[in-house]
Amino acid sequence: MAKAMEMAYKNLEEETAYIKGLKKYMIEKLESEIEDVQFYGKCTDIDDSLYTVLSCNFPESENSEMLMFNLDIKGVACSGGSACSSGSSKGSHVLTSIVPDSMRPGVRFSFSKYNTKEDIDFAVDRLKELV
């Protein structure tokens, strides 16, 4: 157990900085390439939010209801709503409290040391096709 912990924490600072950079890059890409994207809570504050997660929503469109399905078909791994409502067929009570009465599709992206800027470019390009 001690060896596993040692290995997990060996490069933690470098990996944290790398992942924060990816999240910042995705925020900048979304803001510059998708009109009217909205971010939930403080998730754009890299130092005051969970650095491995970005939650946002997009303008309503004819593809809104099928956004998650279409992203999956196009090879983008992401989740709908909040982690608190994962697996539920009902909307997220957490996100509803942040953005009440929103019909905008919400998406949650997660980042790890295994992601790249190319992954983000791919995801944003697919989003641009759908929103």
Question: Where in the sequence are the language-model features?
Answer:
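Pyridoxal 5′-phosphate
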Residues: A2-V131
